[in-house]
Amino acid sequence: MRIGLDLDGRLDERPDFFAFLTAALRSGGHFVAVLTYRDPASQAKTEAQLSGWGVAYDEIHFARSLSDKGRLCRELAIDVYFDDQDECVVGVGEKTTVFKIRNGGNFDFGEQKWLSIAKLTRLL
């Protein structure tokens, strides 16, 4: 399986979880790509950050825009893609399963309850 992970607003929200997930995926022979809209000039810093978090990956790609991640998913033949923004999942292609996860999760800590689908849809 080929997995794509957004960095900012997704992977950096729970690097411990994604370190565990990527290690398990790669040890199972799966391909992991990190897709980010960071400046390509920050590649060394970004790679150091991922290494510091223990995130295992095969490739890192720097998108030219948020919507460019769709093209990258198609070119890399990504099967499953995790992101947090609508603009990033446009154009991924029908063969890619998208897990779009809102920043901060789906629990309203102020109200101390899970968000309903209707409320979550309005927020998104």
Where do the model's predicted regions map?
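Alpha-helical substrate-recognition element adjacent to the catalytic core
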Residues: 1-66
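C-terminal cap/substrate-recognition subdomain and adjoining C-terminal extension
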Residues: 41-124
